[in-house]
């Protein structure tokens, strides 16, 4: 995964937490770049990335941060059956890199995934 195109830029995240939901907003140099929302009751994830920031590896970082935030908030992150091809591709890439693992439809962030996030921005 790469973020070379934005090297030197500062990534930051704002998170919101509900009883069974989380939201993560990603900013690049203070500019809104995208958001991740997860509802544990329905198992639905929603990811939006501003077109300006697409094809730079940021969607994968946002998804990884979203899964990490859900798990750290005490929510089980289950696979969303209504996902898009782009979401599937990002999840496959994260799994292939060893950053997430699927255990019987429950997804977990690995130690390598956590270290990758730490390199991108403080958790």
What are the residue ranges of the model-derived segments?
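Conserved acetyl-CoA-binding loop-helix of GNAT-fold acetyltransferases
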Residues: 55-68
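Conserved active-site tyrosine of GNAT-family acetyltransferases
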Residues: 88-95
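Conserved GNAT acetyl-CoA-binding A-motif
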Residues: 70-83
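Conserved acetyl-CoA binding element of GNAT-fold acetyltransferases
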Residues: 35-36, 41-52
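Conserved beta-hairpin
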Residues: 10-33
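Proteolytic processing junctions in secreted/extracellular precursors
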Residues: 3-8, 119
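C-terminal "cap" of GNAT-fold acetyltransferases
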Residues: 104-123
